[in-house]
């Protein structure tokens, strides 16, 4: 399975998610958010992973990069390529699908227990620790 990972240049390491995907035999291509003109195409890509970022989709100054990533989401959806977003990546998917992303009145940071009744094995392993 080939995964396209989109992240910021200095922070494009897929971390524990990448470790787990590698353990099950997935391979990666990487696109750096700051350079959408240099992005690899979706040809042969089975899954898109949008990593977190210090950016927000509503920030001024990164509109072109956000628009390029929104286009990538739309193209992946049209081709039936699954998309997984982490933090900023999830914001971007919501934005691309017409949702609103706004600044919170107060910061929200914390760790929460997550469980799945439908797919209990998906949460096992070090990648979600």
Roles of regions detected by a PLM:
Residues 34-35, 90, 108:
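Conserved beta-strand edge residues that scaffold enzyme active sites
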Residues 75-100:
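Catalytic nucleophile loop
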